[in-house]
Amino acid sequence: GPLLGDRGGSYQVGREGLRAVFRPGGAPTALREELVHFAGLSSVDHLKQEIVPLSVRILGDRTAVAHYAALVNRCARAGDPVAVAILEQAADDLSETIEYLVRQADVAGCALPMVGTGGMIRHSDIYWNRLVRQVTGFLPQVRPLRQDMPQVAGRALAGLREAIRNGACHVDAAASRERLLATLPPLLAEIRPQQETPSLRTTR
């Protein structure tokens, strides 16, 4: 998890975004205004007044930190250099983990696929492009495959495959797979919009 590992994940991105906001003497960044809105505050000055209770609330909810990663990505897309640097560092950290695994498995000379899943990869071109560049440096024949569907799609496909294999579902496998892939995205969009970022409203 994020306390011991998970380098390069959304928790790291959100955490570094929050650190950039509160770092004394830190570079100007649009992340401050994003946090003001995220926390339901009225201004940056209000943010300074609420720093202690806000910190306690954020530390008590790790998902709030991970959700802030979407705001870091938004600022990065708008050209904020602090946000861009956070995403690139996270991608570098993940690439180091991949490099370790590649060397341990002794497959640096192989042509292997790299399937990218998860929110950071799905929603951030900056993150994904940086990751691909870094991995290509130690795995030249890598085939980057960016999956634009959530991980639940893979679980649904695995469940369908098992149901067909066990005889619990008598349907055409290929047709069922295509139907699932076609109907899942709009269904998920209705349940939970992409990059949903719930507000962290302050309370008295």
Each model region followed by its residue ranges:
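Hydrophobic alpha-helical segments and helix pairs
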Residues: G1-P28
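ATP-binding/phosphotransfer module of carbohydrate and carboxylate kinases, centering on a glycine-rich
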Residues: R19-R204
